[in-house]
Amino acid sequence: MKRIVAALDFSNATPGVLEMAASLAKAHGAELHLLHVLEPEPTYTAYGFTPDEFPAIHTFQEEARKRAKQKLDEVAAEVPDGVSAASAELAEGSPLQALVDFIKEKEADMVVLGSHGHGVVASLLIGSVAEGMVRKALVPTLVVPAPGKG
């Protein structure tokens, strides 16, 4: 095993995902690649609106991007000594598709992700990402439960 991807949603599952991925990376001498996926800007074209009609959406998305990058940098700083944290990247788009693309790009041998996100909507979304990864089975997939789950 040479490359492990840790998919991070910044929920209460994130510390466990990072700990498990880092432990596996250290045990196998593998590179650790961190990924967080930011949802794309909402579009309301079905209602006849264009994104340019709502500059606040762009401002909100840019602020979300900055905060996500800051949080990703904070999490990357928590990677233990002895683990090669090769990259910490922020992607935008569909979480499942972005994760699949990242795994292919990095030629990862394994992915570690949390079973549920934060909040009702996020937990459904992240749950569906975990389920999608297991179904696609591009690489071995380790799903780490959030504290209090299971």
What are these regions (language model features)?
Residues 74-111, 148-150:
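Structural beta-alpha unit
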Residues 2-54:
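Small/aliphatic-rich secondary-structure junction motif
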Residues 36, 114-116, 145-146:
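Short secondary-structure boundary segments
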Residues 49-53, 105-106, 129-130:
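Short, hinge-like loop/turn segments at secondary-structure boundaries
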Residues 10, 110-132, 150:
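Glycine-rich, Arg-bearing micro-motifs that act as flexible, cationic patches
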Residues 35, 87-91, 142:
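General small-molecule cofactor/ligand-binding pocket signal
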Residues 54-70:
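A short acidic, glycine-rich active-site loop
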